[in-house]
């Protein structure tokens, strides 16, 4: 088995999917998991990008079906901007599409800036823009877990195969969640699910961005990665890609393994 095949298997990627079937499977997963845990529903941060839009709509479909079956669950969508978000219009469009039971907005700027200032005062140096970006991601997850803990809700994560293979998420930030309904999907497969669900094409054709950096607001994921999502998707779907691209992907996969594992102990061997 080639490394490419090993990665596809580890990340549960299917080269070809039926969007209708995948939607049904993922809604059923959300329903089964929330029932099994006894939780009262879900909470998810909504950025206006493809991934949170898809996960949010799947979550809303799941809670509506459970209520129709006599259950009592809810879904809260959370906006978590740092000051004014450049693509706020897209976030509002996503919320309109998702139709969450409840939506709330937390501006994380005061919390992030207060921490950054205290860090500088105590340690005598400013956080790098990259590190501050990770603080933003972790404050967003703190907020979602506060809501979840207070109301008995599960935190949904938006990680999918194209992020997982590169480790392109913040450890214990957007990588922190209770369940991951998009696992195994490539970026283009996620787009296909949104198309099937009737989303505005603006929500899945827009340039993907983590938008965590003050110095480079709205920087494209592909710029930061040095790899395009089409290349990642081709690789994950078992297609041929240029040797240098495969090497980049496989190197990122190897060095980011710790992000896909629980914290290492001396009894684990995945890190050796």
Curated annotation (Swiss-Prot):
Q: Which GO terms describe its cellular component?
A: cytoplasm
Q: Which InterPro entries match?
A: NAD/GMP_synthase, NAD_synthase, NH(3)-dep_NAD(+)_synth, Rossmann-like_a/b/a_fold
Q: Which CDD domains match?
A: NAD_synthase (cd00553)
Q: Which domain of life is it from?
A: Bacteria
State what this protein does. Catalyzes the ATP-dependent amidation of deamido-NAD to form NAD. Uses ammonia as a nitrogen source.
The family classification in the record reads: Belongs to the NAD synthetase family.
Per UniProt, ATP binds at 45-52, 158, 187, 209
User: Which residues are deamido-NAD(+)-binding?
Assistant: 138, 171, 178, 258-259
| NCBIfam families given in the database record | nadE, PRK00768.1
Keyword annotations for this protein? ATP-binding, Ligase, Magnesium, Metal-binding, NAD, Nucleotide-binding
Q: Which GO terms describe its biological process?
A: NAD biosynthetic process
Subunit organization: Homodimer.
Instruction: Report the EC code(s) recorded for this entry.
Output: 6.3.1.5
Q: What name does UniProt use for this protein?
A: NH(3)-dependent NAD(+) synthetase
Which taxonomic lineage is given here?
A: Bacteria, Bacillati, Bacillota, Bacilli, Bacillales
| Protein encoded by which gene | nadE
What Gene3D superfamilies does UniProt report for this protein, alphabetically? HUPs (3.40.50.620)
Q: What does the entry list as the binding residues for Mg(2+)?
A: 51, 163
Q: Which GO terms describe its molecular function?
A: ATP binding; glutaminase activity; metal ion binding; NAD+ synthase (glutamine-hydrolyzing) activity; NAD+ synthase activity
Which pathway does it serve? Cofactor biosynthesis; NAD(+) biosynthesis; NAD(+) from deamido-NAD(+) (ammonia route): step 1/1
């Amino acid at each position: 088995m080639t490394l490419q095949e090993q990665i596809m298997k580890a990340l549960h990627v299917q080269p070809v999917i039926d969007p209708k079937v995948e939607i049904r499977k993922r809604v059923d997963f959300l329903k089964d998991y929330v029932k099994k845990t006894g939780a009262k529903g879900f909470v998810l941060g909504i950025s206006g990008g493809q991934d949170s839009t898809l996960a949010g709509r799947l979550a809303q479909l799941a809670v509506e079906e459970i209520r129709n079956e006599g259950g009592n669950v809810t879904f809260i969508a959370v906006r978590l901007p740092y000051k004014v978000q450049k693509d706020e219009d897209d976030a509002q469009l996503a919320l309109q599409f998702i139709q969450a039971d409840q939506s709330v907005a937390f501006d994380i700027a005061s919390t992030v800036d207060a921490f950054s200032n205290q860090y500088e005062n105590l340690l005598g140096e400013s956080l790098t823009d990259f590190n501050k970006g990770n603080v933003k991601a972790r404050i967003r997850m703190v907020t979602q877990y506060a809501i979840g803990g207070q109301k008995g809700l599960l935190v949904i994560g938006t990680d999918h195969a194209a992020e997982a293979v590169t480790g392109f998420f913040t450890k214990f930030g957007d990588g922190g969640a209770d369940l991951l309904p998009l696992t195994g999907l490539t970026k283009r497969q996620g787009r296909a699910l949104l198309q099937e669900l009737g989303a505005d094409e603006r929500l899945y054709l827009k340039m993907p961005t983590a938008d965590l950096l003050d110095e480079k607001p709205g920087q494209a994921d592909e710029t930061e990665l040095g790899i395009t999502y089409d290349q990642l998707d081709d690789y994950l779907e078992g297609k041929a890609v240029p040797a240098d691209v495969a090497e980049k992907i496989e190197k990122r996969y190897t060095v980011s393994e710790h992000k896909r594992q629980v914290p290492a102990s001396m009894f684990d061997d995945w890190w050796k």
